[in-house]
Amino acid sequence: MNIFDELKERGLVFQTTDEDALRKALEEGFVSYYTGYDPTADSLHLGHLVAILTSRRLQLAGHKPYALVGGATGLIGDPSFKDVERSLQTKETVVSWGNKIRGQLSNFLEFETGDNKAVLVNNYDWFSNISFIDFLRDVGKYFTVNYMMSKESVKKRIETGISYTEFAYQIMQGYDFYELNKNYNVTLQIGGSDQWGNMTAGTELIRRKSNGVSHVMTVPLITDSTGKKFGKSEGNAVWLDADKTSPYEMYQFWLNVMDADAVRFLKIFTFLSLKEIEDIRIQFEEAPHQRLAQKTLAREVVTLVHGEKAYKEAVNITEQLFAGNIKGLSVKELKQGLRGVPNYHVQTEDNLNIIDLLVTSGVVNSKRQAREDVSNGAIYINGDRIQDLEYTISENDKLENEITVIRRGKKKYFVLNFK
């Protein structure tokens, strides 16, 4: 199966400018292609992973990737299907975020070896050297206002208002494609389906300015089986940066994917062969309660993003927390597994008697409730049940002299911080 048809089989091709021509180009030749990443945050997230992994698949098939960091466009802000205008960031912030994105991309694309090793470019390099007058004369004249207004991403913002800054974004992205086509013979741009209007601005500019042929391929914006935008956990983005979303949190995210989505996501987010995925599908449908598809997803993606060691740590944290074995984990692992649970910083004047501390730290609302919970065996300190109403937190309860973990009932965790 050629690479284009495999991408289609995996559900990774949403729209193309000319499917037959693109398939032929990928089958018969060596294609240089690019994907752009604007530094709109200090990390990429799961939403970016579809395009990143598609880029990697093409590289493995022998084609050459260019990764464009939008040092210039990141200063402007893409209006595509955004309800309101993005807040403008400082140059220093955009540079810092761009550097972090570079580091993350190197985890997925091969930048060091091979004839088709990836190349990193920054559009600030060419936009910083072109004057506004030259840009209007040499680029702007190829775009009619009617053409620009026809883009769906612009139409959706006309009613609420769109600044000229954001309106001009599509020309900037189009010029990126032109520059890469002219200087590196890049003939294919890959991006999310919400980028279609900006991306085809590039093919139009290449056609009109240099009479060249170029292609666009969009990957789908992933939604779950309920239609909800994929890539968020509890309303928050799932980041590729371990400091923003821990490997454990990412592991849990994939483990909790709905049955209806699991096999589809294996095709999109893993490098398992289609035959391997089909075998998993058969086993999964025979015994969905064993969650083979979700466990495989979690293993493959966490290992891909964070490495095998981080994956094994995430599994261990999951197993130990499920068993209530708090002492079997390091403080570092506990902080991963219990990120997001209520934390209380113990003050020097706090009474460390269990009844008082349960109220002070917010575990319960009253001393009466605290006494009832302790008496009924509902309170655990570092995994050990406490039923002594006079129990006082001691140095022995401070894990690595830093935290104490309280559990109320089966699942409600609280962390006491002593630092």
Swiss-Prot record:
<dbReference type="InterPro" id="IPR002942">
    <property type="entry name" value="S4_RNA-bd"/>
</dbReference>
<dbReference type="GO" id="GO:0003723">
    <property type="term" value="F:RNA binding"/>
</dbReference>
<dbReference type="InterPro" id="IPR024107">
    <property type="entry name" value="Tyr-tRNA-ligase_bac_1"/>
</dbReference>
<keyword id="KW-0436">Ligase</keyword>
<dbReference type="GO" id="GO:0004831">
    <property type="term" value="F:tyrosine-tRNA ligase activity"/>
</dbReference>
<dbReference type="InterPro" id="IPR036986">
    <property type="entry name" value="S4_RNA-bd_sf"/>
</dbReference>
<dbReference type="Pfam" id="PF00579">
    <property type="entry name" value="tRNA-synt_1b"/>
</dbReference>
<feature type="short sequence motif" description="'KMSKS' region">
    <location>
        <begin position="229"/>
        <end position="233"/>
    </location>
</feature>
<comment type="function">
    <text>Catalyzes the attachment of tyrosine to tRNA(Tyr) in a two-step reaction: tyrosine is first activated by ATP to form Tyr-AMP and then transferred to the acceptor end of tRNA(Tyr).</text>
</comment>
<protein>
    <recommendedName>
        <fullName>Tyrosine--tRNA ligase</fullName>
        <ecNumber>6.1.1.1</ecNumber>
    </recommendedName>
</protein>
<comment type="subunit">
    <text>Homodimer.</text>
</comment>
<keyword id="KW-0694">RNA-binding</keyword>
<comment type="similarity">
    <text>Belongs to the class-I aminoacyl-tRNA synthetase family. TyrS type 1 subfamily.</text>
</comment>
<dbReference type="InterPro" id="IPR054608">
    <property type="entry name" value="SYY-like_C"/>
</dbReference>
<feature type="domain" description="S4 RNA-binding">
    <location>
        <begin position="352"/>
        <end position="419"/>
    </location>
</feature>
<keyword id="KW-0547">Nucleotide-binding</keyword>
<dbReference type="InterPro" id="IPR024088">
    <property type="entry name" value="Tyr-tRNA-ligase_bac-type"/>
</dbReference>
<dbReference type="GO" id="GO:0005829">
    <property type="term" value="C:cytosol"/>
</dbReference>
<feature type="binding site">
    <location>
        <position position="34"/>
    </location>
    <ligand>
        <name>L-tyrosine</name>
    </ligand>
</feature>
<keyword id="KW-0963">Cytoplasm</keyword>
<dbReference type="InterPro" id="IPR002305">
    <property type="entry name" value="aa-tRNA-synth_Ic"/>
</dbReference>
<dbReference type="InterPro" id="IPR001412">
    <property type="entry name" value="aa-tRNA-synth_I_CS"/>
</dbReference>
<dbReference type="InterPro" id="IPR002307">
    <property type="entry name" value="Tyr-tRNA-ligase"/>
</dbReference>
<dbReference type="InterPro" id="IPR014729">
    <property type="entry name" value="Rossmann-like_a/b/a_fold"/>
</dbReference>
<feature type="short sequence motif" description="'HIGH' region">
    <location>
        <begin position="39"/>
        <end position="48"/>
    </location>
</feature>
<keyword id="KW-0648">Protein biosynthesis</keyword>
<feature type="binding site">
    <location>
        <position position="232"/>
    </location>
    <ligand>
        <name>ATP</name>
    </ligand>
</feature>
<keyword id="KW-0067">ATP-binding</keyword>
<dbReference type="GO" id="GO:0006437">
    <property type="term" value="P:tyrosyl-tRNA aminoacylation"/>
</dbReference>
<keyword id="KW-0030">Aminoacyl-tRNA synthetase</keyword>
<feature type="binding site">
    <location>
        <position position="169"/>
    </location>
    <ligand>
        <name>L-tyrosine</name>
    </ligand>
</feature>
<dbReference type="GO" id="GO:0005524">
    <property type="term" value="F:ATP binding"/>
</dbReference>
<feature type="binding site">
    <location>
        <position position="173"/>
    </location>
    <ligand>
        <name>L-tyrosine</name>
    </ligand>
</feature>
<dbReference type="Pfam" id="PF22421">
    <property type="entry name" value="SYY_C-terminal"/>
</dbReference>
